[in-house]
Amino acid sequence: MKQYQSWLGDYLMSRRDEDHAMASELANTICAFWKAQGDEAETSKWQQRYQQHVEQAQ
């Protein structure tokens, strides 16, 4: 959980800085974390955030 909190902090900073490439990478990492935890709701939420940032990064 400590690693998740670190990723989340980095994700929030990348959003603040409008660094969508970094935000998408972190969202994908967080998505994989929740998938490994077996939490489908969080996995789905982070998959959507990942896709949003990928689209904005282009």
Give the role of each language-model region.
Residues 1-28:
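N-terminal acidic leader/helix
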Residues 20-58:
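Short, charge-rich amphipathic interface segments used for partner binding and complex assembly
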